[in-house]
């Protein structure tokens, strides 16, 4: 069983690394503007091909948000994406199915009907604020959430990383129950990168998150296998050689 545990741990560690890569790339391109700084100093952006590098300017200009890459517009968050309240689904009406239910605190079971197409991005609206979730599958965002109904100049992976940077707790409009008003988020001033650059980031980040999804599925399968085999092995229903054969096939 230790081989199973090791494989599950490795998959989870790999996913943490992959997710960190997508986040670091976003911050480098759209927050710290590292490629622009490199070009302004006469250097080629590190680890970047010429076509992608050409999408970045080679200087900065003053704006109401401070220094921003030359030519990039200043707008509001709603120029990038539109948030919408999720859909009510009482527990008594839920039927287990293929589509994830996403609450303010994260995935919360499944349902046989989806209300939104994936890839999608969801954050908490009521109860739990500040968590942001990316799903590549069709899904049902519950009514305690806000989900990205429309990607304007943003894409799914770009929106995911952008929303993770926001301090949603500071927008709390509730009293006893933390509540997020989407209009407060929509009106935030934000620098708007060229659509071509956002799409270039999406091409890289989406492939990363697809790998994460595949690893999660494999880890889930292995976890279910471990939880099935272990009681049978302990009870004597399954012999060790038989267990080892099953593990070899799984791994």
Predicted region positions:
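Non-catalytic DNA-recognition/assembly elements of restriction-modification systems
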Residues: 2-32, 50-103, 195-202, 206-242
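DNA target-recognition domains and sequence-specific DNA-contacting regions of bacterial/archaeal
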Residues: 37-193, 241-251
């Amino acid at each position: 069983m230790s081989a199973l545990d090791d494989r599950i741990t490795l998959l989870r560690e790999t996913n943490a690394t992959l997710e960190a890569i997508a986040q670091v790339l976003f911050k480098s391109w759209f927050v710290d503007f590292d490629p622009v700084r490199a070009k302004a100093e006469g250097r080629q952006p590190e680890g970047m091909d010429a076509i992608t590098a050409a999408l970045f300017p080679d200087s900065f200009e003053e704006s109401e948000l401070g220094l921003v890459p030359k030519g990039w517009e200043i707008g509001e968050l709603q120029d990038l994406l539109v948030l919408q309240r999720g859909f009510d689904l009482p527990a008594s009406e839920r039927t287990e199915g293929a589509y994830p239910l996403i609450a303010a605190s994260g995935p919360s079971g499944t349902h046989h009907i989806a209300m939104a197409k994936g890839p999608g991005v969801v954050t908490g609206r009521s109860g739990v604020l500040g968590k942001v979730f990316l799903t590549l599958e069709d899904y049902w965002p519950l009514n305690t959430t806000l989900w990205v109904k429309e990607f304007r100049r943003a894409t799914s992976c770009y929106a995911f990383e952008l929303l993770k940077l926001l301090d949603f707790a500071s927008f709390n409009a509730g009293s006893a129950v933390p509540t997020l008003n989407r209009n407060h988020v929509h009106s935030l001033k934000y620098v708007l990168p060229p659509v071509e650059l956002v799409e270039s980031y999406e091409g890289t980040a989406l492939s990363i998150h697809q790998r994460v999804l595949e690893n999660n599925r494999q880890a889930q399968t292995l976890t279910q296998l471990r939880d099935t085999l272990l009681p049978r092995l302990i009870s004597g229903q399954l012999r060790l050689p038989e267990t080892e054969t099953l593990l070899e096939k799984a791994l």
